[in-house]
Amino acid sequence: MEENFYENEEKVDGYAEFTPTHDGTLLIDVLGEYLPEAAAVLELGMGPGKDFKKLSQRYRVTGSDFSQLFLQRYREQDPAADLLRLDARTLETDRTFDAIFSNKALIHLSSDELQQSFERQHELLNDNGLILHSLWFGEGERSFNDLTLVYHNEQDLTKMLETSFDIVALEKHAKMSDDDSIYVLARKK
């Protein structure tokens, strides 16, 4: 993961300005088809908190990020928010959830790190719990603004998830251009 990037105030400001209209409304609506209101949801990589706010309208949400700077900034807006500092690779918490959600937060993890994260997410989910994650669609890695972006396709994600999860939906969608993204919705076996 890109630890230093998200602790730099200038880069965090740039990130927030770069993504002003990119929120997870589509993803949250998909989750809403399968998850009852008031369920316990963990958001990974909440960043400036756009999706956290939307998720909070339906669910009991715990926001998380590895960036202390993002967490600090959100706490200034909402001191009562339930926030955790978590590394998406290891997810060191003893809390459990009905669903785990991320919108492009796991894009910096290598395939091995993503597999490790999925295994840990399985442990943190209650029975029949769900994951919903959006990632960049494609193959390989690319660099962007001092960050490494890892791309995934249907086959990669199916292989990583098939032993511990039943895949409910695996769909391409548009984030910045047609079919540049993929989301996976899966249920704990």
Features from the language model and the residues they span:
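Short alpha-helical functional segments enriched in proximate histidine and acidic residues
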Residues: L124
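Class I (Rossmann-like) S-adenosyl-L-methionine-dependent methyltransferase catalytic domain
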Residues: M1-A39, M46-E92, L109-Q116, R120, ...
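Short catalytic micro-motifs in class I SAM-dependent methyltransferases
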Residues: K104-A105
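A conserved beta-strand element that flanks and buttresses the S-adenosyl-L-methionine
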Residues: F101
